[in-house]
Structure formats: structure tokens, C-alpha cells
């Protein structure tokens, strides 16, 4: 509750401990303990010369990440909703955090079963279509840093890459086809296709995906679904400022 206090979030706090103790209605000794914990985790930094505290690097990074994620979500909502309406399949948008993806939007189609990809859910990026779409658009050295050895690979269903070499092959196929795929890697009986969403820096800021019951689509339906997914990914990237080739 202390962290949510509206007057705590200032870039600098003059006479920090006294001000915070008064505003929060807690003893100064408790304030010192809280500030030490926040400083230890990089959330605040001590400004000795000014006898004050400022926002730490971790807080700045979290704020920047939230700002980016919030904008992506706002822009993506209508695009994803229309895609789900057009295809009749469940859709979602996810962002990369470490070697996991976090689902930030989920749009459920009518008469389709619920998925594990609810908003806020984290899953290993190497197993998900959204994660693979993002990873395939990152520099290879960045992917290797996220997945340096076999120990970095977790498993859900026994399917999916289990080593850096296998992941590299999976991502190479994604780059070749322009689509990331997973077939029961996350949940048995469900398949997903995904594309990377890029921002104005040509950075893969998110993955856009559709998930459907395995074997429920005819080949021509799958082709149509992929086409609509690609067009939606291109539109969303354009809306986020991407200007390069997105085909």
C-alpha cells in the first residue's frame, strides 16, 4: 500500500524520511527500512549530496516497459478484435520478458474453448507461437543470451525445442515461412500461428497469434487464416510506426 501512495512517486524527495513518514503516517524507522529495501532492489537511488532519494534504474525501466506495453495494448485491441471476428478463432497478443512471454490481450471467439493464454499469464517463449515469432526477429546473439544452454529450456508437453541448436532450427523455419507455429507444444490438442509485430525502430515489440483446435481447419481455411493474420500483423506494425518491409 505504501508504494501506491500518490505522493511517494516523485523524482526527488527533499528530507525524504521526514516527508515520507508524515505523508504515510508511519514511523521514520519504518521509512528507513522501506527505503533500504527499495534501494537494494534498484527501485530508488540515494542522492547523498542533496540528502534525497530519486527514482532508481529498475523503476525507470519498469515505467518505460509499462508505457510501451500500454500503448501497444491500446493500438492492438481493435486490430485483434477484428481479426478474431473475421477468423472465428481465439486471438492473443504477447510481449517478451526475459525468456518468457506475457499475454497482454486475449480475444475469445464465440463457441471456442478457453485457453491458458489469459492476460498476465507467462509461458516459455520457445514453446509458444508468439514467443517464437518475436525470437525469430531478434538478433541471434540476443537469442543465445536468453537460451545459452539446455538448462534454459523448460518443457510442458514433451514437444518443442530442447536445445539452442533445435531452437535455432525452429526460428530459421519461422523466418523462412514468415509464420511461427506450435502444434501442441503448450496445450495438447491446440495449434497456433503467430507473426511478429514491429515498432518504429523495427523492433519486434510483440507477437500476434491465433489459436485453434488441432485438425479443425481444412488446408484452405489454414491458408486464409494465415493471410488474415499476416495482414493484421502488418496493420498493427504500421500503426505502431513501422516503416520497413513487413511482408
Locate the predicted segments by residue.
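Amphipathic alpha-helical effector-binding/dimerization core
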Residues: 49-50, 54-151
Amino acid at each position: 500500500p505504501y508504494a501506491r501512495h500518490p505522493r511517494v512517486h516523485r523524482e526527488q524527495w527533499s528530507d525524504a524520511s521526514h516527508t515520507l513518514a508524515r505523508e504515510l503516517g508511519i514511523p521514520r524507522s519504518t521509512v528507513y527500512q522501506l527505503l533500504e529495501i527499495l534501494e537494494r532492489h534498484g527501485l530508488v537511488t540515494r542522492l547523498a549530496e542533496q540528502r534525497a532519494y530519486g527514482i532508481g534504474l529498475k523503476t525507470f525501466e519498469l515505467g518505460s516497459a509499462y508505457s510501451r506495453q500500454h500503448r501497444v495494448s491500446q493500438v492492438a485491441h481493435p486490430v485483434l478484435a477484428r481479426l478474431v471476428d473475421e477468423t472465428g478463432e481465439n486471438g492473443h497478443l504477447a510481449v517478451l520478458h526475459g525468456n518468457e512471454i506475457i499475454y497482454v490481450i486475449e480475444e475469445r471467439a464465440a463457441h471456442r474453448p478457453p485457453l491458458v493464454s489469459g492476460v498476465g499469464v507467462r509461458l516459455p517463449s520457445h514453446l509458444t507461437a508468439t514467443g517464437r515469432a518475436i525470437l525469430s526477429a531478434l538478433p541471434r546473439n540476443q537469442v543465445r543470451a536468453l537460451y545459452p544452454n539446455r538448462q534454459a529450456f523448460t518443457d510442458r508437453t514433451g514437444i518443442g525445442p530442447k536445445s539452442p541448436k533445435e531452437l535455432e532450427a525452429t526460428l530459421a523455419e519461422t523466418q523462412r515461412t514468415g509464420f511461427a507455429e506450435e502444434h501442441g507444444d503448450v496445450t495438447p490438442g491446440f495449434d497456433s500461428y503467430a507473426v511478429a509485430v514491429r515498432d518504429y525502430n523495427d523492433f519486434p515489440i510483440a507477437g500476434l497469434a491465433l489459436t485453434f483446435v488441432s485438425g479443425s481447419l481444412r488446408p484452405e481455411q489454414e491458408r486464409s487464416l494465415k493471410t488474415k493474420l499476416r495482414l493484421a500483423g502488418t496493420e498493427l506494425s504500421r500503426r505502431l510506426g513501422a516503416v520497413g518491409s513487413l511482408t
